[in-house]
Amino acid sequence: MRNNARARRVLLSLFLAGAAAVACPSAHAAPPPPHTSYWRERASFFQAFAAHADVAMVGDSLTDGAEWAEMFPGLRVVNRGIDGDTTRGVLDRVDGILAVHPKRVFVMIGINDFADEHRTVDAVFRDYSVLVSRLQQGGASVVVQSTLPCNAARAAWKSCKAVNPRIQQLNARLAALATGSTRFVSLSALVAPDGGLRDDLTFDGVHLNGRGYQLWKEAIAPFMP
């Protein structure tokens, strides 16, 4: 009988623990996925080559795919974008960004948090806020750029329609970070009336063509040091 009673207590404990986990899922948030080999290669490169720069451009594939030094030839600009990166990924490599002692850091990140990791707006904004704080503590002024949406008609992944509303919500909250040495730049010139990326600025629904990068440059040029 004592063994049966003990078994019942164990089962009850397991049931209550499971119920608590269901009731409070945030207490057991999924860990971030491991970094890709490309992420590790790029982050390692950034650590190995840390020449001083006026500006660091930080982000995911949209940032990674641009030739920023050619776009702003009068400034020492380094590309610190990594294809597929997320807010958590950027937080993991802040030291490599600050190693170039940038006067100003331009950040645009977030779409992969929603599309690949299915995170909430609250979680992404929380990480974004920590990122801005850490960059400021490292001596850089920060320019937060609105996160660009995707084009649902052209994007290969079907979740684009679900991602764009979350990007809009994130951007509304990012604008509130513009205090003190932090500025916010809206890239609304690249966004269509339906809230997606403009048809004429992308071939695959996510990444920009040359005209898209021209408009991006025009939007941020006034904020260059």
Predicted features by range, described:
Residues R93, V124-L131, V163-R166, L170-L174:
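A general structural detector for well-ordered alpha-helical segments in enzyme core domains, enriched
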Residues R80-D85, S188:
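Short beta->alpha junction loops
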Residues G138-A140:
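A short helix->loop->beta-strand "cap" motif at the edges of active sites that frequently abuts
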Residues W39-S44, T86-D92:
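N-terminal post-signal-peptidase region of extra-cytosolic proteins
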Residues A30-P32, R76-R80:
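Short, basic, glycine/proline-bearing loop/turn elements
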Residues P149-P225:
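Catalytic His-Asp segment of secreted/periplasmic serine-dependent ester chemistry enzymes
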Residues M1-A56, W68, A99-V100, W157, ...:
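N-terminal secretory targeting modules
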Residues V58, T63-V78, R88-D127, R134, ...:
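Oxyanion-hole/transition-state-stabilizing segment in secreted/luminal serine hydrolases
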